[in-house]
């Protein structure tokens, strides 16, 4: 049945169908005859093999094997031009020489005339790695020479023309050269600049901590000479420079004499009546007089303003009465009390007694600093108050009905004075022997409004209450 269907006369003719008509590679062998019976069991396979043999037969002549020389080389036009220039004896070549080199080396460009020469010309003119060299007169010919830029010899990776690192640009090359020069100069000047840098920093530090700088707004003493000045806690010492009569810039004076911790401790441990005078500290600004005040860090409740804590008389203290304070409540806008200097104080007093300027440090336990143990001395009655602690426009003599002499009155303590004045009772805390019949008193001296205003939260104004 199978043989009747396919009507194969010779079973050996199964493998005779040639793949190549000219060369019969699959010839019939004796072994193929024994395969006729088992292959007849698979009719589809037999039909497939016959159809495959027939289908591939007629198309073989239209697929000729292309020679290797006709394949396009895997090089760019820049690589081809570079090859031509580098193979030239003088490393320069004309345009026709580039054409000839490419056609001799690569036969693909010999037969393929599809505009590759135009591409060569474009690459020569557009790429900066190729430099046009004018032709010398000694060598006759046509066309200029083309050469490579000296900086473009390494534009291919490892000498391989298949890979180019990046597009060559002269701007990048110039920039790289400048960077190299800067790096070389930086390396050469590196040790010198490192040696000069500490000197410059040292100069800056010396200028910032120079003792010649005037300390106006700062509390800490930046001078290295003031070893005893308080630098740890700014609240412990509030310093305002006093004024010298001569406005001379001081040479390095140890400004910590009246502001040191030792002086504060001696004032606290000394008896209440013995108040040591503060030495005069010269200052650059000689405009507004002011007094140095020492505040301790513990004085929260018993610190008063300068007008009431600091006083002066011929023996060492000034006190103020309620009546005088009530008289001058509206005439004194400022709460700063400040004598200008010790020399003026001693020159204005005609009784010949010394008037030391005192500054007090009120501790937390000291509530009555000025006691009744202060000396009372009477002077001549017609002597008016010293004009150096008064305002120029508000002298005592201008007040009618009151004669202010130099008779001194003392109070039992400062706390009692302020309590009575705050309650508005003028005569409750004053005994009969404290206020004389002619109502003479020595009032607290006040100056013009100071430009250095005390920003301490512990200072109270006598005229407020």
UniProtKB/Swiss-Prot annotation:
GO terms for molecular function: DNA binding; DNA-binding transcription factor activity; DNA-binding transcription factor activity, RNA polymerase II-specific; promoter-specific chromatin binding; RNA polymerase II cis-regulatory region sequence-specific DNA binding. Residues 230-258, 352-383 have a biased composition (Polar residues). The gene is foxc2-a. SMART domains: FH (SM00339). One of its GO terms (cellular component) is nucleus. After the mid-blastula transition, expressed in the dorsolateral mesoderm but not within the dorsal blastopore lip. During gastrulation and neurulation, expressed within the dorsal mesoderm and the lateral border of the neural plate but not within the dorsal midline. In neurula stage embryos, expressed throughout the entire somite-forming mesoderm, at the border between mesoderm and ectoderm but not within the notochord, neuroectoderm or lateral plate mesoderm. GO terms for biological process: anatomical structure morphogenesis; cell differentiation; mesoderm development; positive regulation of DNA-templated transcription; positive regulation of transcription by RNA polymerase II; regulation of DNA-templated transcription; regulation of transcription by RNA polymerase II. Residues 174-196, 219-258, 339-385 are annotated as: Disordered. Pfam families: Forkhead. Residues 174-186 have a biased composition (Basic and acidic residues). This is Forkhead box protein C2-A. It is found in: Nucleus. The keyword Nucleus applies. Keywords: Activator, Developmental protein, DNA-binding, Nucleus, Transcription, Transcription regulation. It comes from the Eukaryota. Signal peptide: none annotated. Residues 72-166 bind DNA.
């Amino acid at each position: 049945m199978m043989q009747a269907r396919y009507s194969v006369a010779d079973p050996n003719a199964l493998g005779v169908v040639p793949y190549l008509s000219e060369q019969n590679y699959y010839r019939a062998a004796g072994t193929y005859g024994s395969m006729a019976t088992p292959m007849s069991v698979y009719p589809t396979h037999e039909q497939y093999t016959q159809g495959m043999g027939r289908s591939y037969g007629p198309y073989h002549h239209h697929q000729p094997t292309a020679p290797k020389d006709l394949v396009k080389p895997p090089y760019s036009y820049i690589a081809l031009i570079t090859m031509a220039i580098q193979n030239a004896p003088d490393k320069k070549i004309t345009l026709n020489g580039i054409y000839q080199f490419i056609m001799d080396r690569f036969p693909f460009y010999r037969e393929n005339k599809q505009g590759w020469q135009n591409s060569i010309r474009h690459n020569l003119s557009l790429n900066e790695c190729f430099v046009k060299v004018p032709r010398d007169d000694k060598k006759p010919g046509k066309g200029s020479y083309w050469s490579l830029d000296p900086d473009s010899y390494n534009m291919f990776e490892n000498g391989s023309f298949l890979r180019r690192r990046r597009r060559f640009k002269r701007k990048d090359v110039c920039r790289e050269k400048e960077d190299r020069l800067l790096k070389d100069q930086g390396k050469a000047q590196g040790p010198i600049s490192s040696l000069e840098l500490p000197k410059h920093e040292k100069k800056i530090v010396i200028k910032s901590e120079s003792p010649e700088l005037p300390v106006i707004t700062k509390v800490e003493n930046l001078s290295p000479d003031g070893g005893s000045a308080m630098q740890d806690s700014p609240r412990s010492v509030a310093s305002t420079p006093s004024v010298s009569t001569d406005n001379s810039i001081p040479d390095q004076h140890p400004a910590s004499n009246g502001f040191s911790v030792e002086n504060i401790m001696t004032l606290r441990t000394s008896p209440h009546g013995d108040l040591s005078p503060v030495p005069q500290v010269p200052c650059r600004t000689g405009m507004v007089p002011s007094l140095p005040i020492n505040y301790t860090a513990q004085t929260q409740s018993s610190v008063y303003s300068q007008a009431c804590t600091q006083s002066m008389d011929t023996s060492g203290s000034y006190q103020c009465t309620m009546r005088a304070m009530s008289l001058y409540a509206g005439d004194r806008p400022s709460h700063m009390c400040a004598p200008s200097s010790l020399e003026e104080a001693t020159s204005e007093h005609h009784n010949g007694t010394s008037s030391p300027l005192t500054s007090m440090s009120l501790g937390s336990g000291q509530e009555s600093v000025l006691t009744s143990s202060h000396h009372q001395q009477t002077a001549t009655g017609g002597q008016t108050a010293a004009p150096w602690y008064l305002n120029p426009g508000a002298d005592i003599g201008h007040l009618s009905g009151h004669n202010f002499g130099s008779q001194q009155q003392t109070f039992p303590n400062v706390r009692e004075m302020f309590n009575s004045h705050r309650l508005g009772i003028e005569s409750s805390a004053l005994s009969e022997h404290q206020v004389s019949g002619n109502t003479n008193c020595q009032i607290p001296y006040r100056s013009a409004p100071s430009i250095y205003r005390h920003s301490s939260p512990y200072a109270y104004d006598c005229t407020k209450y």
